[in-house]
Design a protein with these regions (language model features):
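Betabetaalpha-Me/HNH-type nuclease active-site subdomain
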Residues: 1-81
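Catalytic cores of phosphodiester-bond-cleaving enzymes
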Residues: 54, 58-125
Length: 125
């Protein structure tokens, strides 16, 4: 997945962080689940899947994006709706880019429907 999220990305040049306004980084992007693993594991029917099906669902390539190390560490397993600030409650607090969040919240909701359908389809097999 790391290769997928870094395709066409130059890790050797300073890059503006798309999620954290004013921040830059020089490194590879980290892999982040758009819909968290915790959320997927709690979806209706997930527990009825075989381990192989669960892994296939958790590794659905559509459900990954690349984030800077700082952004990924800050977000953890929060939804994009709940992830509002980097270093929240500190003097260095930064609001996550509203445009980025809005785009990712929309994508997250789309993926929740896609993943739920994938679960339902697996359970029909």
């Amino acid at each position: 997945m790391r290769k997928q999220v870094n395709k066409g990305y130059n890790k050797k040049i300073e890059t503006e962080d798309q999620a954290l306004p004013g921040e830059t980084f020089i490194s590879s992007l980290e892999v982040d689940h758009i819909v968290s693993m915790d959320k997927i594991a709690s979806m209706d029917g997930f527990g009825d899947l075989t381990k192989k099906q669960q892994l296939e669902l958790l590794n659905n390539p559509e459900n990954f994006t690349g984030l800077s190390k700082s952004a990924n560490t800050s977000k953890q397993s929060k939804s994009y709706e709940k992830w509002t600030h980097y270093k929240k409650g500190t003097p260095d607090e930064i609001e996550v880019s509203p445009d980025f969040r809005s785009k990712m919240i929309t994508r997250e909701k789309q993926l929740e429907r896609i993943l739920q359908k994938q679960i339902e389809d697996f359970n029909k097999e």
